[in-house]
Regions:
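C-terminal intramolecular chaperone/autoprocessing and neck/assembly modules of extracellular spikes
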Residues: 2-86
Length: 86
């Protein structure tokens, strides 16, 4: 019997501003959302993406709250790519 539950993939990336540092606006993404370069507080590397708090104002359905209480963005709903840039 086929499952009615959608396939479970990895959780969306944590995009909560409370977990980011060295935040610099680098442009504007789809839906007129600010695009940022940033680092996470607990790891090395620089990433490019959006802030969940910004997305909530434009497309709240694209933001979920993880079990940890932090906001995550469903980038596929926005047509924006989350990526590591350094």
């Amino acid at each position: 019997m086929k499952s009615l539950r959608p396939p479970m993939g990895p959780p969306p990336p944590v995009s909560d501003v409370r977990l980011k540092t060295n935040i610099q606006r680098i442009g504007t993404a789809a839906h007129n959302l600010p695009l940022y370069a940033f680092s996470y507080l607990d790891e090395e590397g620089v990433y490019e993406g959006v802030m969940a708090q910004d997305v909530m104002n434009v497309m709240p359905a694209a933001v979920v709250v993880g079990e940890d209480g932090y906001y995550r963005v469903k980038y596929d709903m926005l047509g924006i790519e989350f990526r590591r840039i350094a």
